[in-house]
């Protein structure tokens, strides 16, 4: 699977644990890709890169 999760907006897709949210646009991926983002983060699918499994990510820090 593409580690960047490039999928159309609002389409459903599954993201691997290695997904970095670089190209993720679908709402179903936001949680699985950016589990380190706080709830309600609107930037999770916009270049977010997690710094750790339970740490804050670069876009929400």
Swiss-Prot record:
Gene3D superfamilies reported in the protein's UniProt record: Metallothionein Isoform II
A GO molecular function held by the record: zinc ion binding
PROSITE patterns, per the entry: METALLOTHIONEIN_VRT
One GO CC annotation: nucleus
Region described as Beta: 1-29
Sites where the protein binds a divalent metal cation 5: 34, 36-37, 50
Residues found modified as N-acetylmethionine: 1
Keyword Amino-acid biosynthesis attached: no
SUPFAM superfamilies assigned to the protein according to its UniProt record, in alphabetical order: Metallothionein (SSF57868)
Residue positions binding a divalent metal cation 1: 5, 7, 21, 24
Chain sites annotated for binding a divalent metal cation 4: 33-34, 44, 48
Purpose of the protein: Metallothioneins have a high content of cysteine residues that bind various heavy metals; these proteins are transcriptionally regulated by both heavy metals and glucocorticoids.
Oligomer status and interactors: Monomer.
Domain notes per entry: Class I metallothioneins contain 2 metal-binding domains: four divalent ions are chelated within cluster A of the alpha domain and are coordinated via cysteinyl thiolate bridges to 11 cysteine ligands. Cluster B, the corresponding region within the beta domain, can ligate three divalent ions to 9 cysteines.
Protein name: Metallothionein-2E
Species of the source: Oryctolagus cuniculus (Rabbit)
């Amino acid at each position: 699977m593409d580690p960047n999760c490039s999928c159309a907006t609002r389409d459903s897709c599954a993201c691997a644990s290695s997904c970095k949210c670089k190209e993720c646009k679908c709402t179903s991926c936001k949680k699985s890709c950016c589990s380190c983002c706080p709830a309600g983060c609107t930037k999770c699918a916009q270049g977010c890169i997690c710094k750790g499994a339970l740490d804050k990510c670069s876009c929400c820090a």
